Amino acid sequence: AFIMVPAWVRDARADLKEVIDKNIRTTSPMQMPFVTHWLNQMEQDKVLNYISHAGFTNSATDKLKIIFVPCYLDGHDGILNKPYYDLLIGMDATVYPSYYEPWGYTPLESIAFGIPTITTDLAGFGLWAKKHVTGNNISEGVAVVNRDDFNYFEVADAITSSILALAGKDKKETAEIRKRSFCLAAKAEWSKFIVYYEEAFRIALEHASKRNN
């Protein structure tokens, strides 16, 4: 599982870069085996603290490996050295559990690359997607989870269920879900949405004209 959320980065890890550059093979976890870059005030980072609290170790026997990439992915981060979109297309799914987004382009970008996504109805995209999918059903390409101020654990459970449902699909079913992702993304292309911007500007100009007169 990749957590690609920017934090207060200090620098790229020299020890990790050496392992990658020299193609060193080992089953022993490194010091702080979750994070690709050193952070300022690492002891206060909420992501690292929760990973530790949850008991993850990234050992060879762990079924789930976590990689926290805390930098902006511009292709020059010193470790991955690939832009965000080149990494996105390598994912099986994405999760953007928005607490508030006027629109939220990241889940739309995900399905535009055929990567099924999980979002919430507190994102504008999530509200739009709910008009085209039945809800929290990742098989449709987008799962929209209901979220409010009081249902944190229910949201976590719903996201977990969606991930497990996707993980249980076979190759053919996964390919169909990717196709549905592409199809839904096509409905949100700029050529479809430009009419709403034109209407908004028309209304704004009308009101401005009335004020001037």
Name each model feature, range by range.
Residues V5-W8, P70-L73, V95, Y99-E101, ...:
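Short, flexible loop/turn elements at secondary-structure junctions
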Residues I3-D86, V142-V144:
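Nucleotide-activated donor-binding/catalytic signature segment of Leloir-type glycosyltransferases, i.e.
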Residues A93, P97-K179, C183-A185:
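Catalytic binding pocket for nucleotide-activated donors in carbohydrate/polymer assembly enzymes
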Residues D86-L87, E109:
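Acidic donor-binding helix in nucleotide-sugar-dependent glycosyltransferases
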